[in-house]
Amino acid sequence: DKAERGFSFQLDSLLDMRMNQKQKLTAADIVNGYEYDDLVKLLYEYGEEKFAKKIVKAIIKYRQEKGKISRTIELADLINQAIPKFDSTKNPATKTFQALRIKVNEELEEIREILPAAFEILKMNGRLAVISFHSLEDRIIKNFFKEKLNTDRVSKKIPILHKNIQSAPIKIIKKMEKPSKDEISKNIRARSAKLRVMEKISEGR
């Protein structure tokens, strides 16, 4: 991690998180500018954080009493103090930082745009391999694969020849594969990775 980019809760930096430094919105803008309900919704939807309300209450209180939160360590410490202590391999700030990063960089929208574009330029019998690192990404990818797999459904009461029913334009090569224990031991960041692979077998839909 590069501390100056503000992605890490373990390295002190400005609360930035922009992958593209030319864009305006930063993580600090969100943390200091969003109202209570909007922040809670963000942490629930993009971080799947069950302690979202506790965290946001702590953020709002900090803003009212001490002012803006401008450093990554400030926010991480605040989160650590706000939620119940429990044994976990993940830092308590992980989900909040994930939610902020996703929002700042519009990561889910990027995935939704890239998948159909990648499929469109894929040659016949070409394969599309996609790795996700959290459930929100994987859900989008899984649904895209499922959409491509689903053939047009026609009622049995409609007189149509089977040959005229459009078949799925893909076949699944890897439904979902997780890293081995050996791989995780060499690269701890691989622990949440999921690989899905499809092959294009017709132009289809």
Residue locations for each model-derived region?
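S-adenosyl-L-methionine-dependent methyltransferase catalytic core, i.e., the SAM/SAH-binding region
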Residues: D1-R205
